[in-house]
């Protein structure tokens, strides 16, 4: 139904919307792993994503999404907005996976990088691996050094933008 409604919202005729829905879904769902699935999921989520982006913008929160993974981040506490965020998502027909939903306010880790005091850093275990160069091949050691340098550069650039 959501895929069909999305095609209708993009001004496809009901017949074409029905055909496209049949071509891009399996047993009423967007199939995981199909070449079209990411595109369809993003198109279906556009309206909801725009609402969430507008809310985030109003409160100076960074909002990112990749298919069904949503991240909200800010240097300020926005716990009071969580019910509104959940309402927007559910009102648009999506189901929240409460097992995968969490609010983290102290040193959040996003894709393995730690955010602390508006700065990015690599986790302690990463630094220990880097210091224990004997357990790594020279190529691995150089790769880890370059990764840490990249995180440090991004963090420094972000800090300069805050000044």
Q: Model regions: which residues?
A:
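Catalytic palm active-site di-aspartate
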Residues: 33, 37, 58-74
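Right-hand nucleic-acid polymerase module
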Residues: 1-34, 43-54, 75-163
């Amino acid at each position: 139904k959501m895929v069909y409604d999305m095609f209708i919202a993009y001004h496809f005729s009901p017949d074409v919307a029905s055909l496209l829905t049949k071509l891009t879904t399996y047993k009423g769902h967007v199939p995981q792993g199909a070449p079209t699935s990411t595109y369809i999921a993003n198109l279906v989520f556009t309206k909801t994503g725009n609402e969430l982006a507008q809310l985030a913008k109003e409160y100076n929160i960074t909002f990112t999404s990749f298919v069904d993974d949503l991240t909200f981040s800010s240097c300020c506490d926005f716990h009071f907005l969580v019910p509104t965020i959940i309402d927007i998502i559910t009102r648009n027909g999506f189901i929240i996976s409460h097992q995968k939903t969490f609010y983290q306010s102290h040193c959040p880790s996003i894709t393995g990088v730690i955010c602390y005091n508006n700065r990015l850093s690599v986790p302690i275990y990463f630094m220990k691996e880097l210091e224990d160069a004997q357990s790594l091949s020279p190529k691995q050691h150089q790769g880890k050094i370059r990764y840490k340098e990249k995180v440090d550069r991004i963090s420094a650039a972000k800090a300069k933008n805050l000044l």
